[in-house]
Amino acid sequence: MQNSLLKPKAINVEQMGGNRAKVALEPFERGYGHTLGNALRRVLLASMPGYAATEVTIAGVLHEYSSIDGVQEDVVNILLNLKGVVFKLHNRDEVTLSLRKDGEGLVTASDIQTPHDVEIINPDHVIAHLSQGGKLDMQIKVEKGRGYVPGTMRRHGDEPTKSIGRIILDASFSPVKRVSYTVESARVEQRTDLDKLVVDIETNGAISAEDAVRASAKILVEQLAVFAQLEGSELAAFDTPSPRGSTQFDPILLRPVDELELTVRSANCLKAENIYYIGDLIQRTENELLKTPNLGRKSLNEIKEVLASRGLTLGMKLESWPPAALEKR
């Protein structure tokens, strides 16, 4: 009789063209397909980080209900078209970009001037049409965020500092355009009551469908990890008393932090603090790590993400650590 829950062993990714893919996992215990599929779907739609234009300033325009001489579209339609531009920022969370175009012709996303660490995924996206003598000069602020944030929320918060002509946009940050899931039947040997989960996902190109599913799973792991640390049963999954009364640690805690494959900067900062094993690391709190010289918020987030992918978090408690057999460094 098998008492342990089945874990999916077969993973298949089927590319459907464009930025769409189907990710299939099996087998799951009966009911787990819907349990996990619905959770992944909600995270994919609402919690994935992305980038969007949040503020615009257009030369000669005081508000969005305006028109521009020589431009076919009014300002409202220009802003709607601008929301369709897909941005991807590397190593930064916000940037202000410029777009300057004059003379007859199309204005596309490729006309936006970008630094080396800003990428436009759909450069052929049309923003406006200029007629002879037309001119369009605008500044575009792009920020990183999650979900959908109405412009009224930000506009109310910074009303005293709002400059004339600064237009606040509703921002849809999510890189996931559409996601659905189905649960099919799976079979393992004589068991035919198992689930197969198929996630059908389409993104805007800023992230691949596979990476989106992977990132959403990491978010779920990070959010659920805290339940393993409920007061009175800290690390119940990792600390199991042996028959002799000694403490048995999960093998992952005994591995060196080098196996986490952190950046060189983060790894060196940890070693400078005598953090050599994963068990050493998870007992540190965020505040303690931020006090480490040369370890900033970016490195901290990297460490948290790597730990979350393994079902671990910072601030965990380990009794009887380190084990006597652990190598001293």
Curated annotation (Swiss-Prot):
Name-wise, this protein is DNA-directed RNA polymerase subunit alpha
Recorded source organism is: Albidiferax ferrireducens (strain ATCC BAA-621 / DSM 15236 / T118) (Rhodoferax ferrireducens)
Which reactions does this protein catalyse?
RNA(n) + a ribonucleoside 5'-triphosphate = RNA(n+1) + diphosphate
* Assembly behavior: Homodimer. The RNAP catalytic core consists of 2 alpha, 1 beta, 1 beta' and 1 omega subunit. When a sigma factor is associated with the core the holoenzyme is formed, which can initiate transcription.
In the record, the note on similarity to other proteins reads:
Belongs to the RNA polymerase alpha chain family.
Q: Which GO terms describe its molecular function?
A: DNA binding; DNA-directed RNA polymerase activity; protein dimerization activity
Top enzyme class, one word, equals transferase
GO biological process annotation, one example = DNA-templated transcription
Source organism phylogeny? Bacteria, Pseudomonadati, Pseudomonadota, Betaproteobacteria, Burkholderiales
Give the record's GO CC terms. Answer: cytoplasm; DNA-directed RNA polymerase complex
In Pfam terms, one family for this protein is RNA_pol_A_CTD
EC number of the protein: 2.7.7.6
